[in-house]
Amino acid sequence: MNQGRIWTVVKPTVGLPLLLGSVTVIAILVHFAVLSNTTWFSKYWNGKAAAIESSVSIG
């Protein structure tokens, strides 16, 4: 492990919950930002089909 000596400074009983908690908070913030700044993501989570904005002409 490259950063194995961190546990000589921070106890694993403190460091691991902080690490996992910070990852959880960041994931929640990213999901909130995507949900609040897009219109399609909440529809996707609710199971609605995406609307086709424009048709593609071949040829």
UniProtKB/Swiss-Prot annotation:
- A single Gene Ontology CC term: plasma membrane light-harvesting complex
Q: How does it assemble?
A: The core complex is formed by different alpha and beta chains, binding bacteriochlorophyll molecules, and arranged most probably in tetrameric structures disposed around the reaction center. The non-pigmented gamma chains may constitute additional components.
The opening ranks of the lineage are: Bacteria, Pseudomonadati, Pseudomonadota, Alphaproteobacteria, Hyphomicrobiales
Physiological role: Antenna complexes are light-harvesting systems, which transfer the excitation energy to the reaction centers.
Species the sequence originates in: Rhodopseudomonas palustris (strain ATCC BAA-98 / CGA009)
- Cysteine pairings via disulfide bonds: none
Residues binding a bacteriochlorophyll are 31
Q: Which GO terms describe its molecular function?
A: bacteriochlorophyll binding; electron transporter, transferring electrons within the cyclic electron transport pathway of photosynthesis activity; metal ion binding
Single GO biological process annotation from the record:
photosynthesis, light reaction
Any idea which UniProt keywords this protein has?
Antenna complex, Bacteriochlorophyll, Cell inner membrane, Cell membrane, Chlorophyll, Chromophore, Light-harvesting polypeptide, Magnesium, Membrane, Metal-binding, Transmembrane, Transmembrane helix
The residue ranges for the Periplasmic side of the membrane come to: 36-59
- Membrane topology type, per the record? Single-pass type II membrane protein
Cytoplasmic side of membrane? 1-11
Q: Which family does it belong to?
A: Belongs to the antenna complex alpha subunit family.
Q: What is this protein called?
A: Light-harvesting protein B-800-850 alpha chain E
Question: Transmembrane stretches, by residue range?
Answer: 12-35
Documented effect of changing residue 42 to P: In strain: 2.6.1 / French
Location comes to: Cell inner membrane
